[in-house]
Curated annotation (Swiss-Prot):
Its EC number is 5.2.1.8. Coiled coil: none annotated. This is Peptidyl-prolyl cis-trans isomerase. The gene is CYP. The keyword Disulfide bond does not apply. Pfam families: Pro_isomerase (PF00160). The lineage of its organism: Eukaryota, Viridiplantae, Streptophyta, Embryophyta, Tracheophyta. It comes from Allium cepa. Binds cyclosporin A (CsA). CsA mediates some of its effects via an inhibitory action on PPIase. Belongs to the cyclophilin-type PPIase family. CDD domains: cyclophilin_ABH_like. It is an enzyme of class 5 (isomerase). It is found in: Cytoplasm.
Amino acid sequence: MELFQDVVPQTAENFRALCTGEKGMGDRKPLHYKGSSFHRVIPGFMCQGGDFTAGNGTGGESIYGAKFKDENFIKKHTGPGVLSMANAGPGTNGSQFFICTEKTAWLDGKHVVFGQVVEGMDVVRAIEKVGSQSGQTKKPVKIADCGQLS
């Protein structure tokens, strides 16, 4: 993953720190993606994960507290591999994110794009294959480990 730290530094830092787990405990659980799942996968659209508190898309927590505001909408949902924040409306970013598997221009101005898959798109495509139109996965898809590469 390449994170757009120059364009959306707060959003990129949230994702990076949740990958490393370096911030320790959140409200009730560690602030870490490790062991969490991709709970919503829709082929031809996106793979969504990052809810490490509830595991079903209703939870999540940022390193800044429960939620944080939309930083900006400079980057767009231009195609496969775009990394963007999932939310429940304006200013509700937490830890949930999604990886686009196609261009999703209708999300521009609503979800903050903060990165791009630069290597491993084959893994994203493999995750996409276990999804369904309802978003439910045919089998669990877990983040076995995560961190930061130098």
